[in-house]
Amino acid sequence: MAPRSLYLLAVLLFSANLFAGVGFAAAAEGPEDKGLTKGGKGKGGKGTKVSDDDTNGTDPDPEPEPEPEPEPEPEPEPEPEPEPEPEPEPEPEPEPEPEPEPEPEPGAATLKSVALPFAIAAVGLVAAF
């Protein structure tokens, strides 16, 4: 049976690598502004930036409602048209080529950079037990 210090060391390694992996994932999102966004229905759609001129869904200058128009006179029934000839079926369009995957930005976290600390921690845990 391994000494208690090896168990503690393995847990500490795992925790450190876990936090490092979370840091890599956060760095991958980029330094863009994480300002407030509003969701749901309303101006701008879901997930748009909240602006200072937001009027909370009320229209500051409501337009007056138009007056109802008089009903038009009924028109005589048109004569039935002859049946048109069936159109030929269109040919199937060729499938577009898939777009190549864009290369990751420099310094962005990749699967390899995030998974490597977890793999090291897992090996450490297995070795400790």
Curated annotation (Swiss-Prot):
GO cellular component: plasma membrane; side of membrane
Signal sequence, start to end: 1-27
Taxonomy, superkingdom: Eukaryota
Keyword Phosphoprotein on entry: no
Membrane topology: Lipid-anchor; GPI-anchor
Disulphide bridges: none
Spans of repeat Sequence: 59-60, 61-62, 63-64, 65-66, 67-68, 69-70, 71-72, 73-74, 75-76, 77-78, 79-80, 81-82, 83-84, 85-86, 87-88, 89-90, 91-92, 93-94, 95-96, 97-98, 99-100, 101-102, 103-104, 105-106
Carbohydrate-modified residues: 56
Propeptide residues per the UniProt entry: 108-129
Subcellular location field: Cell membrane
Region (Disordered): 27-111
Region (24 X 2 AA tandem repeats of [DE]-P): 59-106
Lipid attachment site numbers (GPI-anchor amidated glycine): 107
Main localization of the protein described in the UniProt heading: membrane
Keywords: Cell membrane, Glycoprotein, GPI-anchor, Lipoprotein, Membrane, Repeat, Signal
Acidic residues compositional bias, start-end: 53-104
Known role: Major surface antigen of procyclic forms.
Identification of the protein by name: Procyclic form-specific polypeptide A-beta
